[in-house]
Curated annotation (Swiss-Prot):
It comes from the Eukaryota. The keyword Secreted applies. GO terms for biological process: body fluid secretion. This is U-scoloptoxin(21)-Sm2a. The keyword Magnesium does not apply. GO terms for molecular function: diuretic hormone activity; G protein-coupled receptor binding; toxin activity. It comes from Scolopendra morsitans (Tanzanian blue ringleg centipede). Belongs to the scoloptoxin-21 family. Expressed by the venom gland. Its main location: secreted. Residues 1-21 form the signal peptide. Keywords: Secreted, Signal, Toxin.
């Protein structure tokens, strides 16, 4: 069983040498890295022509405020 695992590890290391470098979103840097990744993904979604776009908030209607008990 150990020998089979060793072969798989060696094969995966050989394949990884030919790949392009991975993009680092900072996910391995803890909480601040996760926040940075979420920020960058949000910017990408807001600027994507097929994406949801920027959040637009409706204006507050004064009548709704006045009717509040």
């Amino acid at each position: 069983m150990f020998f089979l695992g060793f072969i798989i590890v060696c094969a995966s290391e050989e394949q990884s040498d030919n790949r392009l470098p991975n993009i680092d979103f900072g996910l391995d840097r803890g909480h601040s890295g996760r926040m940075t990744a979420e920020y960058l993904m949000g910017l990408a979604a807001a600027n994507d022509p097929n994406g949801p776009g920027r959040r637009r908030r409706s204006p507050i209607v004064r009548e709704e405020i006045l009717r509040h008990p």
